[in-house]
From Swiss-Prot:
Its EC number is 3.1.13.-. GO terms for biological process: DNA-templated transcription termination; mRNA processing; nuclear-transcribed mRNA catabolic process; positive regulation of chromosome segregation; rapid tRNA decay; rRNA processing. Residues 429-438, 481-490 have a biased composition (Basic and acidic residues). Residues 991-1009, 1041-1050 have a biased composition (Low complexity). This is 5'-3' exoribonuclease 2. It comes from Aspergillus fumigatus (strain ATCC MYA-4609 / CBS 101355 / FGSC A1100 / Af293). Residues 534-556 have a biased composition (Polar residues). GO terms for molecular function: 5'-3' RNA exonuclease activity; RNA binding; zinc ion binding.
Length: 1058
């Protein structure tokens, strides 16, 4: 997904949304593996109903894994996919439904990003093969053409082209058939699957996998008999699954993913037997297995743990953060969540480049939230409604961002320069420490001679070999536990130190070159396509313009390794020997990348449009044209997330985004989309694959990609420009490929279609979802009686949700299926046998279509879990919300302070002006006395009175009495209760209110007091007067903020602070 590092940012800001998955693993008894019994209760303490697999997140890491050798062939790949999928199912244990969704043909808006990724992936695969060939020649030269056969085979082996994981290729056809076989096999052989319904949506069904899943969830919500308390789990590595989970408005929703930040050094240790890999409660008392002759080896764990991301807890956090005190319209959490999702689109998505002034690592989302909160009173309503954006209100948010853009760019540059200076300093200090350690080692050596010449260039006294070169890596064991690799190497060096020395001197050159090339490959983003489309291990997915992904080598990913160590390794060119070719030195790490636009200097907008778009910098109308296209894109993306694809043919026609200041009069735009039809699979292949991946495309189209006479040869450049766009590495830059002209492409392909074989025509067709159930499922007899009895029923059979256990939709007979026929297998040699009697049932499944708009609201009958956040969590979130978004690159604060409020409505009237007391004087920021200046005429309450210790005092008499004396948030009969749709399925009488007694005020969460005033928990003592009548309580500390919120819009200056 296009918000890079979103997962890391969310987990840092909202820590309680993450929890580890408790997983039971199979174990061995007397050499026999005992499988996990998933019919037992879920060890995570909560049963799950539906599991959805975004299958590309499984296919990519299984076909080209990181950290271990890839499967030898496609059969082994299928087995790895089965194992991984089985593990996910075992840990989730869905009780009702499993949906497997593979990416089909994507909307045109996504194809531009796919095209850039696949061109980059093919280029990197080609470079990897060239490096392997170069290394093979070097080994042959250094060893006199005597190279180990196994090593020779590994070097010569071509890099597997991950571009075949695209709809329409033979590989995807094999994947679809293999998945259907494996599901049927599980239904026949695994009792835990007997009551499970499985839906497979393979690559022949148009749409991205995660969006096909969302379409299914929306269709089930529209069914009258849908259970509103269905518990959903979706697996995938894309960060947008989090926002899609929010967009469903299903309160019981989790995202499952690998813990990509897991550190192997923190393996679990059992305190009973002392072995790693399990905890005490999982101990089976087995003897420790000896690894190595002296038990010097450590048995590493090959399985990464999984984690939950609880969307329900994220909803709680956002409920506190997005609530604006005294907003002039009812607070509606579901609408506010939609606005939050919409604002995330500005920071990055798969369809639009992010705005230049917004970066998630600079807390760009916080900046937008702060602007949104400030403008809520002015907008008079929310930004979005059921997937439709109000562009007039969006204009206000962009105007607010535009006022901060100059300061954001300047502060970004200052931060980059500080970071560079710190890196230089750390490197210099590390170098000085290393030199000092080297001097100490030389002094302690019996061969030490205090001479000016370097020790390494002299032979020691008494003859013998020369001292080893300084570049030779030495092992310095720490006091703590040595890593497995270090123990193995230490043991080897002790036993075979003589051989190690001779081998080291002979092979140092080859090792240095190999290491250098591998590190260069890592820098350049090897397997960039895989990481972005499923095999991501330590980062969230890159956006369309390939944003900075520094997390790829961050210390938290690499364990205890320091950032400067990583950089030193990345630039280490080794120590070439006599026969080694010179290794080019990497670009200097102590210099900022060249940036000719210079966003931090005056005139950056002119330079930006002149260099990036190639237009006259004075052409203001072009800037507005780009901004209008971007606004259209925002509307498209929002509809795509909340209602489904609004247009298969629309796309953003530029490589770069406009500035926030360029969005002028977008509120007057009328946006409509032509639905269109999706591409056929071969058309997408021709649109996204480079010519070097033509092996995945039918031969009849090859000449269109390679012949100089081809009418579309310009679509397939062998070399293409990469704009670093201020980044350090090429893989972070913007790939400048020509956009595909749909009409030209389809016209050229139309001439070749008659030459396709029957199998190729079948791969190019549009498929359907299939539903599989076992013979033991109650629905089995119902469907067999309709489709396979002597008196057959209707052709399209509408499912009875009581019999189907909550599944809505229609099914049709699958002509390729015959009841109780054999189930052939092409994987028998891998332990997947054929079955003589297939006792499962396969039918075509049709997702029900609804004529109604999917409403952004909770369904009637929802029952919430107990709140996960306590009052302290809520107050902390609210405090941050009121003081965030300024110190991360926005306009400077008055007096250099952090936080505070900013009014972006300098040219708009104060919406509260008619209600303010003319005699009121707002508090002065930074009051010397430490406490606020109280309103004139205000008198402290008498101890023991009704208003005593009840939060902040009331405003002056006659001032905002209407708003202050309303029942506080979470208190009072019916204030935030609503009817939740009584009398109608969608609860349209809800009016944006929430029953606090059932959710947000459970367990006295808000202490029965006004949540916008903070309650007793927010005042650090609950009122100072209760402590002897002095002013020590926390109430006055927050009163200043309360007054700021009440009167923040009085300031007429756009950068005023209160």
């Amino acid at each position: 997904m296009g918000v890079p590092a979103l997962f890391r940012w969310l987990s840092n800001k909202y820590p309680k949304i993450i929890s580890p998955v408790i997983e039971e693993l199979p174990y061995e008894v007397n050499g026999e593996e005992i499988p996990v019994d998933i019919t037992k209760p879920n060890p995570n303490g909560e049963e799950m109903d539906n599991l959805y697999l975004d299958m590309n997140g499984i296919v990519h890491p299984c076909t080209h894994p990181e950290g271990k050798p890839p499967p030898a062939n496609e059969q082994e790949m299928m087995v790895e996919i089965f194992k991984y999928t089985d593990r996910v199912v075992n840990m989730v244990r869905p009780r009702k439904l499993l949906m497997i969704a593979v990416d089909g043909v994507a909307p045109r808006a996504k194809m531009n990003q796919q095209r850039a990724r696949r061109f980059r992936s093919a280029q990197e695969a080609k470079e990897a093969d060239e490096k392997k060939e170069e290394f093979r020649k070097m080994l042959a030269k250094q060893n006199g053409n005597k190279v180990d056969e196994e090593l020779q085979e590994e070097v010569v082996k071509k890099t597997w082209d991950s571009n075949v994981i695209t709809p329409g290729t033979p590989f995807m056809d094999i994947l679809a058939a293999s998945l259907r076989y494996w599901i049927a096999y599980k239904l026949n052989t695994d009792p835990a699957w007997e009551k499970l319904k499985i839906i497979i949506s393979d690559a022949t069904v148009p749409g991205e996998g995660e969006h096909k899943i969302m379409e299914f969830i929306r269709s089930q919500r529209a069914a009258p008999e849908h259970d509103p308390n269905t518990r959903h789990v979706i697996y995938g590595l894309d960060a947008d699954l989090i926002m899609l989970g929010l967009a469903t408005h299903e309160p019981h929703f989790r995202v499952l993913r690998e813990d990509v930040f897991f550190q192997e050094s923190r393996a679990r240790t059992c305190h009973l037997c002392g072995q790693q890999g399990h905890k005490a409660e999982e101990c089976r008392g087995q003897a420790k297995e000896k690894n190595g002759e002296f038990d010097e080896k450590q048995k590493g764990s090959s399985l990464k743990p999984f984690i939950w991301l609880h969307v329900s807890i994220l909803r709680e956090y956002l409920a506190a953060e997005l609530y604006v005190p005294h907003q002039p319209f009812p607070f509606d959490l579901e609408r506010a969540l939609d606005d939050w999702v919409f604002m995330c689109f500005f920071v990055g998505n798969d369809f639009l480049p992010h705005l230049p002034s917004l970066d998630i690592r600079e807390n760009g989302i916080d900046t937008l939230i702060a602007i949104w909160r400030d403008n809520i009173p002015v907008m008079g309503g929310y930004l979005t409604e059921d997937g439709h954006v109000d562009l007039k209100r969006a204009q206000l948010i962009l105007q607010g961002l535009a006022k901060q853009e100059d300061a954001i760019f300047r502060r970004r540059r200052q931060a980059e320069e500080r970071k560079l200076a710190n890196e230089k300093r750390r490197k210099q200090e590390a170098k000085a420490r290393e030199e000092e350690r080297a001097r100490k080692r030389r002094r302690s050596s019996p061969t030490y001679e205090p001479m000016d010449s370097p020790v390494g260039h002299r032979a020691p006294r008494g003859g013998g070999d020369a001292a080893p070169p300084n570049q030779l890596e030495l092992i310095t064991p720490s006091r703590g536990e040595l890593s497995r690799q270090t123990r193995e190497l230490t043991h080897s060096m002790v036993v075979n130190r003589g051989a190690v020395y001779r081998a080291n001197m002979a092979n140092k050159s080859a090792a240095a070159v190999l290491k250098s090339k591998l590190m260069q490959g890592s820098q350049n983003g090897q397997n960039g396509e895989e990481k972005s489309e499923g095999a991501t291990t330590n980062n969230d997915e890159p956006s369309q313009d390939q944003p900075d992904q520094t997390e790829q080598t961050s210390p938290s990913v690499l364990g205890k390794r320091k950032a400067d160590l990583v950089e030193e390794e990345d630039t280490d060119a080794g120590t070439p020997g006599r026969d080694s070719p010179a290794v080019p030195v990497a670009a200097k790490e102590d210099e900022l990348p060249p940036d000719t636009v210079r966003l931090w200097e005056e005139g950056y907008a002119d330079r930006y449009y002149e260099q990036k778009f190639g237009v006259d910098p004075q052409d203001k109308e072009f800037r507005h044209k780009v901004a209008r296209a971007y606004a259209e894109g925002l509307a498209w993306v929002l509809l795509y997330y909340f209602q489904g694809c609004p247009s298969w043919t629309w796309y953003y026609p530029y490589h770069y985004a406009p500035f926030a200041a360029d969005f002028v009069d977008i509120g007057d735009m009328e946006i409509t989309f032509d639905k269109g039809v999706p591409f056929k699979p071969f058309e997408q292949l021709m649109g996204v694959l480079p010519a070097s991946s033509n092996h995945a495309i039918p031969k009849v189209f090859h000449d269109l990609m390679s012949s100089p006479d081809s009418e579309i040869i310009d679509f397939y450049p062998e070399d293409f420009a990469v704009d670093l766009n201020g980044k350090k590495f090429a893989w972070q830059g913007v790939i400048l490929l020509p956009f595909i002209d749909e009409k030209r492409l389809l016209a050229a392909m139309e001439k070749k279609y008659p030459l396709l074989t029957e199998d190729e025509k079948l791969r190019n067709s549009v498929g359907r979802e299939v539903l599989l159930i076992s013979e033991a499922h109650p629905l089995y007899q119902d469907l067999v009686a309709n489709f396979y009895s002597k008196k057959q029923g209707v052709q399209k059979y509408k499912l009875n949700m009581r019999i189907s256990d909550g599944l809505a939709g229609k099914v049709e007979r699958n002509e390729a299926y015959i009841p109780h026929s054999s189930l052939p297998s092409s994987l028998e040699e891998y332990g997947m046998p054929s079955l003589e009697d297939d006792r499962s049932l396969t039918v075509n499944y049709e997702i029900p279509k609804s004529n109604h708009v999917h409403k952004s609201m909770l369904l009637r009958g929802v029952k919430f879990n107990p709140p996960a956040l306590d009052n302290a969590d809520i107050q902390a979130v609210k405090h941050k919300a009121q003081n965030s978004g300024r110190s991360y690159g926005g306009a400077p604060l008055r007096g250099g302070q952090k936080g505070g409020r900013i009014n972006y409505a300098s040219d708009r009237p104060n919406p509260f002006a008619a209600h303010l007391d003319p005699g009121f004087i707002p508090p002065v920021p930074g009051n010397v006395g430490g406490g606020p200046i109280m309103p004139s005429g205000w008198v402290p309450p008498i101890p023991g009175s009704a208003g005593f210790s009840r939060g902040p005092p009331p405003p002056p008499h006659g001032g905002m009495s209407g708003s202050h004396h309303r029942p506080p948030y979470g208190q009072g009969p019916g204030q935030y209760q609503g009817n939740h749709g009584q009398g109608d399925h969608y609860g349209q009488g809800q009016q944006g209110y929430y029953n606090q007694s059932s959710y947000y005020n459970q367990s006295n969460q808000y202490n029965g007091r006004s949540s916008d005033h903070g309650g007793s928990g927010g005042y650090r003592g609950g009122g100072g007067y209760h402590r002897g009548g002095n002013y020590r309580g926390g109430g006055y500390r927050d009163q200043r903020q309360y007054n700021q919120d009440q009167y923040s819009s009085r300031n007429s200056g756009g950068y005023g602070r209160y």
